[in-house]
């Protein structure tokens, strides 16, 4: 698997975060620094938001809303993956964007 890449129903999606995205997430109430210190536990609303922000950098023409991201997330979970694998892909992409070494 390529880092940050997931396949859903034969279509590839790349999850990537940059500093502008991380700041936008904070403004939206999703503090990734609290996540990195263990102060924040993700619920499904936050997971969908994290997924949306990761997709919107590269797939902005296809993923225009959190609901769009939720549909892709549901398709992934129904057809090809599980929530733990998807969460690991998102967290590892986020860790790389912050300049830390990847962890599991």
Give the label of every model feature segment.
Residues 16-17:
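Short linear motifs in exposed loops
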């Amino acid at each position: 698997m390529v880092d940050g890449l997931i396949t859903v129903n034969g279509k590839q999606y790349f999850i990537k975060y940059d500093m502008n995205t991380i700041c936008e997430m904070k403004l939206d109430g999703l503090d990734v620094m609290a996540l990195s210190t263990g102060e924040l536990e993700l619920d499904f609303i936050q997971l969908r938001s994290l997924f949306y922000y990761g997709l919107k950098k590269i797939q902005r023409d296809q993923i225009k809303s959190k609901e769009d991201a939720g549909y892709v997330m549901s398709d992934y979970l129904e057809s090809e993956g599980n929530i733990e694998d998807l969460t690991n892909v998102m967290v590892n992409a986020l860790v790389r964007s912050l300049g830390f070494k990847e962890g599991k």
